[in-house]
Every structure is written in C-alpha cells, then in structure tokens.
Design a protein with these regions (language model features):
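Acidic, low-complexity terminal tails and accessory targeting/binding regions
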Residues: 3-28, 104-105, 111-123, 169, ...
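Active-site-proximal alpha-helix that buttresses catalytic centers in soluble enzyme cores
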Residues: 7-17, 22-28, 33-105
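Generic beta-sheet signal
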Residues: 30, 162, 169-178
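Short beta-strand scaffold positions
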Residues: 82-83, 153, 174-175
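Phosphate-handling substructures
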Residues: 96-157, 222-223, 236
Length: 236
C-alpha cells in the first residue's frame, strides 16, 4: 500500500498519500456503512427467524451517523445505495432523509445468503464446524442458499460495478458486516486463508472508506470501522 501509514484514533487505519500541486486528485470514494443494530426474531412467535428492522438503539446509532455526515467537511456523497434487506433499507432511508439523498436499493449489496432463517443458530454453527475447512467456501447450507465462494464473487462484482458506474463520485453504500469484511478480500486481493487468522471489525453504523485516484489501479483504505460518532454522551 502506498502512502505514509500512521497510527489513527479508534483503531482505524489511515493512509495519507502526498497530494500533487494544484489540489487533490480526481477520486472515486466509496463509504461502506454497516446498518444500525437490528432485531432478529419470528413473526408472531412462529416461522423462520427474520429481520424485524432497526432496534431503538439502532435508530439512535443512525441518528448519530446522520448528524456526523451532515456536519462533515470531507464526506460529501452524491449517491446513496442500499441493500434491500430491512435493517439496511431503514438505515438508508433515515440517512437519505437527513442528507437529502434518494435511496437506490440493490440486492447485490445484501448480506451472505447462507440460509433462509429456518436453521437455528446452534444448528447452523454445528453444521459449519462439521464441514472440512477446505470445503467450507463451497458448502451450501440449503439447496437455495449461496455458498461463501459465490458470496465473495458477488461482493467483488458489486463493488467493481458501482466504482465504474460512479467513477470520480462519492458514494454511500449501506450494507452488512459480512459484505464489508468481504470487501477487504476484494480490494486487497486476499485469498481464502486470510480470514482464518484475522478479520476486520465492522460495528453497527460504522464507516469504512475506500478511495481510488484517477488513473490508478490501486485502492487505498483511508480508514475502517470508524464509530467516533457513537462515542459522544447522550442521545443524538
């Protein structure tokens, strides 16, 4: 990675490349936002476990994030894209209302479609642990579900497409923890073994900022898992 790597607050990574004379370069900037805290449960106590939308705490997290975005001198998005899943959609609509942006929803930015909610968490993990490590990327929990390898390919394709579509623009993408983690694989070119040793954190309502200069074939991780807006005392 190019640039002078320095310690940054809140456990973030900061890359500060030297700017050319005449001002900052033409950049494509992607801000990956994880949705606020949500509630998972069964409708009327029956059926599969589903996303019931943002919790009260989640709405407060998004309100704090909205206030930060409105006050930020550096984050100036012109496009707001969201996963179609309820927790992300609700987050994006709150952000869009605060920032004056219309929301475009796309299924490509959804979380890993590992199962349909009918597998209980303990049973899911038991099945996962029973699969040989070399086979996990290709394991399908249910006939209609997405393998991990398919998920990683979807993430890469979605990020490539949006960066081409909005080249030179500043884009907010409201998505999920798994998607944000998989984005590190895409941008850094990590292989399957990378996340067996460590993985990046992606807290609720966090910001992870990637940028690319015009003419460069490399992306720069400006910062990740930035939640400074959640650390102030009191309600947003």
């Amino acid at each position: 990675m190019t640039g002078n790597m320095t310690d940054a607050p809140h456990g973030m990574i900061s890359a500060r490349p030297v700017m050319p004379p005449g001002g900052p370069p033409f950049m494509t900037q992607l801000y990956l936002i994880r949705h606020g805290e949500n509630i998972d449960g069964k409708v009327d106590g029956a059926g599969p476990t589903v996303d019931l939308g943002l919790s009260e705490r989640g709405r407060d997290q998004v309100a704090r994030l909205s206030r930060r975005l409105m006050q930020s001198p550096s984050i100036k998005p012109s496009v707001l894209i969201s996963s179609t899943e309820r927790r992300a959609s609700e987050t994006a609509k709150l952000l869009g209302s605060a920032c004056g942006l219309d929301v475009t929803e796309r299924r490509a930015f959804e979380e890993w479609r590992s199962d349909d909610g009918t597998i209980e968490p303990d049973a899911f993990m038991a099945q996962w642990r029973a699969v040989k490590e070399r086979d996990r990327a290709f394991h399908r929990f249910q006939p209609q579900s997405e393998t991990q390898a398919e998920f990683f390919a979807r993430v890469g394709a979605a990020l490539h497409a949006v960066s081409e579509e909005h080249a030179g623009g500043s884009v907010l993408i409201v998505t999920h923890g798994g998607f944000i983690q998989a984005a590190f694989r895409h941008f850094f070119g990590f292989g399957d073994a990378s996340f067996r040793r460590a993985y990046p954190a992606a807290a609720h309502a966090s910001i992870t900022h990637w940028r690319a200069e015009e003419g460069s074939d490399r992306w720069v991780l400006a910062y990740s898992n930035d939640v400074r807006h959640l650390e102030a005392d009191g309600p947003a």
